[in-house]
Amino acid sequence: LDRSSAASDVYKRQVLDLPHSDACYVRAYPAAVAEAWVDGHIHAFAFFGAVPQSIVYDNDRCLVAKILPDGTRKRAALFSGFLSHYLIRDRYGRPGKGNDKGNVEGLVGYCRRNFMVPLPEFATWEAFNLWLEEQCRKRQQDVLRGEGETIGERLQRDLAEMRSLPASPFDACDQDTGRVSSQSLVRYKTNDYSVPVAFAHQDVWIRAYVHDVVIGCRGEVIARHPRCWDRDELIFNPIHYLPLLEQKLNAFDQAAPLQGWELPEEFATLRRLMEARMNRHGRREYVQVLRLLETFDLADLHAAVKQALQMGAIGFDAVKHLLLCRVEHRPPRLDLDCYPYLPRTTVDKTRPGSYMRLLSSDAEDAA
């Protein structure tokens, strides 16, 4: 297995080669870190549907913490746990000797020439890696020089000698702990990630995956963010700060966590109407509408806001009611007490004694 990158690349490639069949697996990552190494293994094993009994590695510092004088390797903690989970025998090439694993070194060049020229463009890492997997599948149809079978046919013999996948995959994440600051931020590496303001000054645990950072307090997950690979950045989730802004309404427009928060235009219309009708209380109700995002999806809340605007029901109670009706799949029925200017209808209850008249009429007709 090999990791490769070039000065012009904005990604890191991880390449796994099965030398007997020449089958390969290639995956791209934004950075060369231990969790990316392990995540690449997990996806490779899922791709082949089996686990190799042994793998030859580079002496990458993400995997090898130290090379001892007798040549044995002291593994990094995450990598050691991964090997124990899959029962893989790890072997290593000599430092600086790429020819110890010449097959995979040649495969890196093949992937660069055939998969990356011209350089493909994708909107997400997931789309990029799905495309790379498809290229690896197509390559299994090739017949290499000197061989009488396709790579895919030879791969079947490799798979017969490999181990079955375990019941559950390894959790490929870097684990850390931290403490929430007074600004409701948690530092991981060089960046700060927000958590709900209710958890200020509390100890938390952190699980950093390749593409996500998950933060929890005791047994509860309290925040999840896309992982930032830049340095000294603040990563906010505006929803985390809404309870505080509900109490400090004057700070709403200047709050840093809300800067750049793009909401559908109907939300701005709702806020304008609320503030025009209810002044300061209207702004508070608008924040309460936004706080519904703590529980519900933006798509559902957006639909409820649009429906409220169409009905002229401008208020938090109306939006919440319409949202609940949408989620519970029942027709909306607004509480008209909130709208005294609407016309009312009154339906009297029938008294049981009224039905006796029908019985007496039937008796007279029978006579």
What are these regions (language model features)?
Residues V108-R207:
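Active-site-proximal acidic segments at structured loop/helix or strand boundaries
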Residues K12-D22, V56, F82, A208:
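Short conserved beta-strand segments at catalytic cores or DNA/RNA-binding microdomains
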Residues V51-G71:
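Acidic/histidine-rich, metal-coordinating catalytic segments
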Residues Y57-D58, P69-D70, I88-R112, E126-L130:
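RNase H-like two-metal-ion nuclease catalytic core shared by retroviral integrases
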Residues L1-Y11:
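Single conserved hydrophobic/aromatic residue that forms the stacking wall/gate
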Residues V26-S54, W229-L234:
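Active-site beta-loop-alpha junctions of metal-dependent nucleic acid enzymes
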Residues G71-D90:
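Two-metal-ion acidic nuclease core segments, chiefly of the RNase H-like superfamily
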Residues V213-A367:
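Protein C-terminal end segments and domain termini
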